Amino acid sequence: MILVIAEKPSVAQSIAKVLGATSRKDGYMEGGNYIVSWCFGHLVELADASSYDERYAKWRYDDLPIAPESWMFEVTKNKAQQFKVLSSLMKDKRVTELVCATDAGREGELIFRLVYDKAGCTKPFKRLWISSLEDSAIREGFNHLRDSKEYDRLYEAALSRSKADWIVGINGTRLFTTLYHKKLVVGRVQTPTLAMLVERDGKISTFQKEKYFNVHVGEGDLTADLEKVKTEEEAKRIAAACEKKQAVVSSLKQETKTVNPPKLYDLTTLQREANRYYGFTAQQTLDLVQTLYEKKLLTYPRTDSQFITDDMEDTARQVISIVCRQLPLFSGVSITPDIARVTDNSKVTDHHAILPTVQLEKQDVSALPQSEQKILNLVGMRLLCATGEKHTYAETQITLSCEGYAFKTKGKTVVQNGWKAVEELFKASLKTKEKDDPVKSLPEVHEGDVLDGVSASVTEHFTTPPKQYTEDTLLSAMETAGNDQFDDDTEKKGLGTPATRAGIIEKLVKSGFAERKGKSLIPTKDGCNLVCVLPEQITSPKMTAEWENTLMEIERGKADADAFLSGIVRMTGDLVKAYPFLSDAEAQRFGTGKEEIGKCPRCGSPVYVGKGNFYCSNKECSFCLWEENKFFSSKKKKLTKKIAKELLDKGWCRVTGLYTPKKPQLYDAVIRLDDSGGKYVSFKMEFDR
């Protein structure tokens, strides 16, 4: 029998249906000479540092850097049962070969291979590589299963990425956490992304707005401008000089311009536009596209290509026709698609651009959740636009000369709306309308025409600061980060991959280093402080972009994985050496993160709230008040934070409701600290006289 392993149960179910594996078992399906099972994402992962040595369970500066010579792997907590199922199936004597049917990409390859290796499996396996979960695509994929060796380098790159993230994350996080006494999460891609947010925020906070003035002259429907005059006095002087004077059309240029259709969606571009049009976060968009993929309504989501292959031309035409029939928004659209414009075999590596599938023909779109309908409309719109006609317009540029000054204006007239007609139809359906540049048409004039008695006016303006990043603009910045450091022949990857960028943004928010305000992403105080204290090799998008390019070269067989990891180990070692200690003031940059309730009666240091106790912050001092202690427990009372604060402040505290076995009723008393400096703190009780 053949064991097929998918990435998640829903995908396994789609595959099992096609293969005829309809008999449900515990953790798998069986039938037709196939057993189909699944992972739940990553079932096996790199082991925690404490698995290598018990002393790593505590975070200590002296233990850094941590760099395993031989890597260990462990089954992900709470997923042990499914790993047990897969391991048992791999060892089943009926199984003679396997099919890796996890997602067709770097992470999917890693998910399967780690389970395969951890289970100690040596049986041969092949690779299912598909871009759609439609029945026809699954059948085609199983008819053309690929040799697993074709993906050894993909696995090598995935494992290298995982190890690099572990080395940078474990060492960077432990280093700066122990130095600053606050958990500071450092990540190979996460940290330079945060640095971009902080840099933008800094530019905004230090921005000094400058005033400038525009002078306008005109007659009737024709107005031209002299922009960015520095002073109001000068602007008013120019306006006064031109008021009621003659203006001559000294220059008139007319040019027909073309705006080519946009490319098809890759994941990042789709996430950007879903954020701009709908306000969806990158993670929300990825989740929605993944759901639609599993419903067989969209092709594979985690792609970085914006093209299709030439053998997909007939399918693309069919899908365009289905989109116009099935999506009510485009029901009136009629186009003659130019498929050649979106076809380029050389620009499709693992997966083609995101498209609707022919399965859309059978779907009642109105029955889908609104959020899924929005994504389908967006992808459908882009397909129609990308294969539509060019948008052409006539642009007119006019210069008016008046009293020695040149005033300019520009207008345009649409010649052929082309693909923009579909985009305008889509934008008109949005609740929040996008502010497009208004199309300004100009009256017909000729060079040399004279305007008599023009009017002149002055308007005041201010320079504007850069805008905070939205997920749209941050994704764009991540995609191009560090690109200027590479030559034109280098394939550039930026920060992260289409599959990981959404998760990186979410980690920044969950770690408390960034927050969302409306559509904007803004660094928090802790986020700004973290970037300030980290060295450039950790915060630099350039270095991380170089790493991403090296990973891509490992995947292509052009770089060595061991050399890549050795370089990262050296970098983290240098990082630890560069931070041997901090001044007391610098160590308090992030605050203690602890609640102080008073001063230690022994040494005067702050006393903090701990887990079940109130302890002196001075490590050389042993003073500690325990919530559950013999004295208070005997009186059926707990030493609360309020009592502890009073004891530290005054040395005594009046406590009510104390218990004694000698009398049936409760009593009140004054409790005093009676500390002699020993291992345990003593108390003394006094009664009212």
Per-range role (PLM):
Residues K93, D135-E219, Q254-T258:
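C-terminal or mid-to-C-terminal helical accessory/interaction module adjacent to the motor/catalytic core
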Residues M1-L159, W166, P465:
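Intrinsically disordered, low-complexity regulatory segments
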Residues M1, A101-A104, H181-K183, Q254-K263, ...:
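Conserved short loop/turn motifs at secondary-structure junctions
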Residues D221-T223, K253-Q254, C324:
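Phosphate-rich ligand and nucleic-acid binding surfaces
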Residues E232-Y265, Q271:
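Metal- or metallocofactor-binding catalytic centers and their adjacent structured scaffolds
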Residues I2-L3, K79, M90, T173, ...:
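Basic, low-complexity terminal or inter-domain segments flanking catalytic cores
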Residues P9-A16, N33-V36, F40, T76-S87, ...:
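Amphipathic alpha-helical transducer elements in NTP-driven molecular machines
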